[in-house]
UniProtKB/Swiss-Prot annotation:
Pathway: Amino-acid biosynthesis; L-isoleucine biosynthesis; L-isoleucine from 2-oxobutanoate: step 3/4; Amino-acid biosynthesis; L-valine biosynthesis; L-valine from pyruvate: step 3/4. NCBIfam families: ilvD, PRK12448.1. Binds 1 [2Fe-2S] cluster per subunit. This cluster acts as a Lewis acid cofactor. This is Dihydroxy-acid dehydratase. It is an enzyme of class 4 (lyase). Functions in the biosynthesis of branched-chain amino acids. Catalyzes the dehydration of (2R,3R)-2,3-dihydroxy-3-methylpentanoate (2,3-dihydroxy-3-methylvalerate) into 2-oxo-3-methylpentanoate (2-oxo-3-methylvalerate) and of (2R)-2,3-dihydroxy-3-methylbutanoate (2,3-dihydroxyisovalerate) into 2-oxo-3-methylbutanoate (2-oxoisovalerate), the penultimate precursor to L-isoleucine and L-valine, respectively. It comes from Xanthomonas oryzae pv. oryzae (strain KACC10331 / KXO85). GO terms for biological process: isoleucine biosynthetic process; L-valine biosynthetic process. The keyword RNA-binding does not apply. GO terms for cellular component: cytosol. Its cofactor is [2Fe-2S] cluster; Mg(2+). GO terms for molecular function: 2 iron, 2 sulfur cluster binding; dihydroxy-acid dehydratase activity; magnesium ion binding. Pfam families: ILV_EDD_C, ILVD_EDD_N.
Length: 612
């Protein structure tokens, strides 16, 4: 049987010094026979999705201790993409994912922890911790801080979120008073932003991967029911320890749970619910860490067979994550996918032996357990707060309408192809991605004129100056992992196109990425990126670009000979922006750029450079 890793520092005469230090943290004689479970918290006062996490690590710790473990908490960093967006702060967002993964690895391995509870929530924190969990491969369970409640105002007919505040701010017809009202109303509570943006998408995907508990992605942060998720996560961590160290059960480990089949399940869910394109980047990165052979070709294959069963903000103003929960949450979507023959239901989870068992118990349309029905009635209270578990509001009824409700069955799918697609062509040899859930069907095939910019800032300036016209393809390059560096999100350009009335009349192509709040014909992750010699670096103003989503194509409409000639010319000049950009690239960012791969590899470090 495997021995507790912690014995390295808790057993033997020569470890007297280490035990003395452990005792100084509060451990006593009887504790040295117990598993030491690390709690990776991510509390910070900078991020609304994390402001309420301060005491929650200790909540989990006390539960771990109650059921026979020793808990030791530490914190990671957390960057708020919305606050960092639109300026050089966004250069740090994606690189922070690697720092988070490294910091969890450093703490867990330095102290020989036996298991791990990951308390995450927002955009790069869940992916960073997921990468670390698959790297470490010790018993691990995820529990997130939960989604924010959607905002409300008398000035809008629909519920609000962050994107509404951003779009109206750039709408010249909106009064200052209306902008201020949207700003005050869009983000009313603690939690991750209320739509199917990156944070919520990733927290939902941990349910499909099998690494978190039902409801992890959908119970609002303010609801009392989420407290039980935290307590149960502590108990599950101890149970996983017993299964691995006491029974050598491989399905107690992240790599025994998050297998190739589980990654396919997660991507199937992502496509079905029209999640953020960032999830592709993060799933690819996690797969690399777990040595799972899951790649862009698998995503492309799945995107052609998985229907879209759910459409949530920003793809529609009608539904937010709180509405997904009322409809049965992620387990309900997984249930519909399973009945459509689209899932690997023998995959393991941290809370059930198989996904099939989990669905049987947690799918609101199938279970007879009234406790499950009550759980999924947990709803928003509409009271602004930064306090977790501060309300216990419940809907009067569940949304189980699978023909016209928030979650559809396969027979009533919103579209027969899902909400994400991978496009290939001479402009993106290794692929690029588009959230088709947010694209109007009238522009699924779009031919436009290239307007080339070598920074997000230049593109924003041009859009706000009304220099971008209907029929243009805005090309923003040298914003990839190396070229940015840091692969900035392009939420401001897409939001401003929408506010200028060009959301259905223009396209945007970039080697950068998009916020989960992006909608419209926004194509990102062009690989290889310009800084790595990608053909997006060869596009010129006035070129014609054809985007063909149904046929998964994206091409620069020039001859192969002309493209080769441009490549030779660019090789001679070097693959870098023509003009020096007014951004400060620090040593930390340069170190990230030196090792970063393009988006088709998840923008992870190029291990060949390290191993070589």
């Amino acid at each position: 049987m495997p021995e507790y890793r912690s014995k390295t520092s808790t057993h033997g005469r020569n470890m007297a010094g280490a035990r003395a230090l452990w005792r100084a943290t509060g451990m006593q004689d009887g504790d040295f026979q117990k598993p030491i479970i690390a709690i990776a918290n991510s509390f910070t006062q900078f991020v609304p999705g994390h402001v309420h996490l301060k005491d929650l690590g200790q909540l989990v710790a006390r539960e771990i201790e109650r059921v026979g473990g020793v808990a030791k908490e530490f914190d990671t960093i957390a960057v708020d993409d919305g606050i960092a967006m639109g300026h050089d702060g966004m250069l740090y967002s994606l690189p922070s994912r690697e720092i988070i993964a490294d910091s969890v690895e450093y703490m867990v391995n330095a102290h020989c922890a036996d298991a791990l509870v990951c308390i995450s929530n927002c955009d790069k924190i869940t992916p960073g911790m997921l990468m670390a969990a698959l790297r470490l491969n010790i018993p691990t369970v995820f529990v997130s801080g939960g989604p924010m409640e959607a905002g409300k105002t008398a000035l809008a007919e629909h519920k609000l979120d962050l994107i509404d505040a951003m779009v109206i701010a750039a709408d010249d017809s909106a009064s200052d008073e209306k902008v201020a009202e949207f700003e005050r109303s869009a983000c009313p509570t603690c939690g991750s932003c209320s739509g199917m943006f990156t944070a919520n998408s990733m927290n939902c995907l941990t349910e499909a991967l099998g690494l978190s508990l039902p409801g992890n992605g959908t119970v609002v942060a303010t609801h009392a029911d989420r407290e039980q998720l935290f307590l149960r996560a502590g108990r599950v961590a101890v149970e996983l320890c017993h299964r691995w160290y006491g029974g050598e059960d491989p399905t107690a480990l992240p790599r025994g749970i998050a297998t190739f089949e589980a990654f396919e399940n997660a991507m199937t869910l992502d496509i079905a619910m029209g999640g953020s394109t960032n999830t592709i980047l993060h799933l690819l990165a996690a797969a690399q860490e777990g040595e799972v052979p899951f790649g862009m070709q698998d995503i492309d294959r799945l995107s052609k067979r998985v229907p879209q069963l759910c459409k949530v903000a920003p793809n529609t103003p009608k539904y937010h994550i709180e509405d997904v929960h009322r409809a049965g949450g992620i387990m309900a979507i997984l249930g519909e996918l399973a009945r459509g023959g689209l899932l690997h239901t023998t995959a393991a989870t941290v809370h059930a032996r198989t996904l099939a068992d989990a669905i049987a118990h947690w799918d609101v349309t199938q279970t007879v357990d009234e406790n499950v029905h009550t759980f999924y009635k947990a709803g928003p209270a509409g009271i602004p707060t930064q306090i977790a578990f501060s309300q216990a509001t419940r809907w009067d009824s569940l949304d189980t309408d699978r023909s016209e409700g928030c979650i559809r069955d396969v027979a009533h799918a919103l579209s027969q192809e899902g909400g994400l697609a991978v496009l290939y062509g001479n402009i993106a040899r290794d692929g690029c991605v588009v959230k088709t859930a947010g694209v109007d069907e009238s522009i699924h095939v779009f031919e436009g004129t290239a307007r080339v910019f070598e920074s997000q800032d230049a593109a924003v300036k041009s859009i706000l100056a009304d220099e971008v016209k209907a029929g243009d393809v805005v090309v923003i390059r040298y914003e990839g992992p190396k070229g940015g560096p840091g692969m900035q999100e392009m939420l401001y350009p897409t939001s401003y196109l929408k506010s200028k009335g060009l959301g259905k009349q223009c396209a945007l192509l970039t080697d950068g990425r998009f916020s989960g709040g992006t909608s419209g014909l926004s194509i990102g992750h062009a690989s290889p990126e310009a800084a790595a010699g990608g053909a997006i670096g060869l596009v010129r103003d006035g070129d014609k670009i054809l985007i063909d989503i149904p046929n998964r194509g994206i091409n620069l409409l020039i001859s192969d000979e002309a493209l080769a000639s441009r490549r030779a010319e660019q090789d001679a000049k070097g693959w870098k922006p023509v003009e020096v950009r007014p951004r400060k690239v620090t040593t930390a960012l340069k170190a990230y750029a030196l090792l970063a791969t393009s988006a088709d590899k998840g923008a992870v470090r190029d291990k060949a450079l390290l191993d070589g």
